[in-house]
Amino acid sequence: MPSSAHLQDSPPLLSRTLTQNEGQTSLRQSSSCGPSATSASESLSGYTESRIPHSEMLQEKFHGIILPESPAKLLCCCAVIVVLSVAVVALSVALSVKKTPQISTVKTYAACPRNWIGVGNKCYYFNETARNWTFSQTLCKEQEAELARFDTEEELNFLRRYKGSPGCWIGLHRESSAHNWTWTDNTAYNKLLPIRGVEKHGFLSDNGISSSRDYIKRNSICSKLNSYTSQCQ
């Protein structure tokens, strides 16, 4: 058993141990919860609180400025896409048409009055009443026409095929054998077919075009430009 002196000496040692523990505890508290720590914590809390209003302000600006422009930008993008799509389609169609050209045949039909026959851009009327050249021209004028004129071989062949009688007055005439042949509107004859004879008025015969004196009575052919042309493809 320990002696009484040893027991009496123990309290001072225990007292020193407790004192050291309290000092260490106090030191830890001062290092963790001292004024500097408290100040740092308060600074961090203030920084966080000061940042919150700034972020809220950015959110308000985002919702107030950017979002209202978004539908307009979306519509603009859609419009651009539509325009580009239409342009691409139009270009494709144009290229396809260019690659495969269409060949169309246009037939022209003269629109002529009743009992008139259309050839090219003219209408012809075959008058079976025999008259001299001057009176035959008068009959044609009454129908807003002239004694027949032809400018192409097609028209000439048509007249020769359908003239009927041995000879029909046409619109060729001249002042004398020394002058050139002209039509009733005084335009020059293109000499599509030679004219036989030395007289001053022309008529269409089985052999072509011949000249005769104007007082001879013959059938006649009138011609005029068609009023309009209808086209069929």
Swiss-Prot record:
* Molecular-function GO terms, alphabetical: carbohydrate binding; natural killer cell lectin-like receptor binding
Classification via InterPro entries: C-type_lectin-like (IPR001304), C-type_lectin-like/link_sf (IPR016186), C-type_lectin/matrix_domain (IPR050828), CTDL_fold (IPR016187), NKR-like_CTLD (IPR033992)
Query: In the UniProt record, does the keyword Isomerase occur?
Result: no
Q: What is this protein called?
A: C-type lectin domain family 2 member D6
**One Pfam family this chain carries?**
Lectin_C
Name of encoding gene: Clec2d6
Q: Where is the composition biased (Polar residues)?
A: 16-29
Q: Where is the sequence biased in composition, kind Low complexity?
A: 30-43
- Record-linked Gene3D superfamilies: Mannose-Binding Protein A, subunit A
* Keywords, alphabetical: Cell membrane, Glycoprotein, Lectin, Membrane, Receptor, Signal-anchor, Transmembrane, Transmembrane helix
Q: Name one GO cellular component term.
A: external side of plasma membrane
- The disulfide bonds in this chain are none
Sorted alphabetically, which PROSITE patterns does this protein's record hold? C_TYPE_LECTIN_2 (PS50041)
